[in-house]
Design a protein with these regions (language model features):
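Active-site microenvironment for binding and transforming phosphate-containing groups
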Residues: 1-172
Length: 172
């Protein structure tokens, strides 16, 4: 990963952008705790609504992220499972009801968003950049059920979208 260039954005220097072969309109970032409004043990850029942080601070932090990435981040309630959510277009739905550990979208203006601490963020994009996905891969999700983990699940959904004509180009 490389640090984001200040000329590219006003993101904190501690945020990292992967160096991966995707079209220029596909962006990914790994945030740090720098740049937000939360205080105390959640300071400063806490994006998680599942902790005892002040809800208004979490919403303000999510607004900081949305402004920085220029897209609507969709957050899931991650449960260390294998379910994959297909995200709607920006503004079509809230994110509080989405229970999944991976998401995929063909919608412009939507940011597939996963939160990780000791788990892995896995990002996918096809070569045209018309299908993108993100997975929260912890050991339970990687192990899965009956031989199918979160990575197999997200890849199946991702591949189906690309194959069905919603996206063009080969899968990376």
């Amino acid at each position: 990963m490389k640090s984001l260039e200040p000329a590219q954005s006003a993101w904190p220097a501690s945020w990292l952008e992967p160096d991966w072969p995707v079209p220029s309109h596909v962006r990914a970032v790994c945030t740090s705790r720098e740049g937000g409004t939360s205080t105390g043990p959640w300071g400063s850029l806490n994006l998680g609504g599942h902790v005892a942080d002040v809800p208004a601070a979490v919403q303000a932090n999510r607004a900081v992220l949305a402004q920085a990435v220029g897209a609507q981040p969709i957050f899931m309630r991650q449960v260390h499972g294998v379910d994959v959510a297909e995200l709607p277009g920006a503004g079509d739905a809230g994110d509080t009801a989405i229970v999944a550990d991976a998401c995929v979208t063909t919608a412009m203006g939507v940011a597939c968003t996963v939160m990780v601490a000791d788990c892995l963020p896995v990002l996918l994009a096809n070569t045209a950049g018309t299908v993108v996905a993100a997975a929260h891969a912890g050991w339970r999700g990687l192990a899965g059920e009956a031989g199918q983990g979160v990575l197999e699940s997200v890849y199946q959904r991702f591949s189906a979208l690309a194959h069905d004509g919603c996206a063009q180009g080969a899968i990376n």
